[in-house]
Amino acid sequence: MAKAPSPLVFPIIFLIIFALVEPNMGCIQIIGRCIKIPDCSASCRKFLGPHASGYCDNDGAGGTCICTYPCQTKEIHM
């Protein structure tokens, strides 16, 4: 019969996986009100590059145009 693994095996594996993976959630920038910017996504790509995307957060008072884009980092990833 096989022996059950120690209760610490899975938490240790979990911690090792998260230590080796560097999370990159991206960056955000607010570029103005949605009533003044007709297409948030196109405006974000114009200002922040082709990998940017945008959406209108309807938080009241005309909404806010929010851009998400990859963060620029000085670190070299291997």
Curated annotation (Swiss-Prot):
A GO cellular component annotation in the UniProt record? extracellular region
Q: Which InterPro entries match?
A: LCR, Scorpion_toxin-like_sf
What top-level branch of life does the organism fall under? Eukaryota
Its main subcellular localisation, reduced to a broad class, is secreted
- UniProt keywords, alphabetically: Antimicrobial, Disulfide bond, Fungicide, Plant defense, Secreted, Signal
Disulfide topology: C27-C71, C34-C56, C40-C65, C44-C67
How far does the signal peptide extend, from start to end residue?
Answer: 1-23
KW Secreted (keyword) present = yes
Subcellular location per the Swiss-Prot or TrEMBL entry: Secreted
GO annotations under biological process? defense response to fungus; killing of cells of another organism
**Protein family:** Belongs to the DEFL family.
Q: Which PANTHER family match?
A: DEFENSIN-LIKE PROTEIN 171-RELATED, DEFENSIN-LIKE PROTEIN 183
Report what the protein is called: Defensin-like protein 173
List the source organism: Arabidopsis thaliana
Give the gene name: LCR63
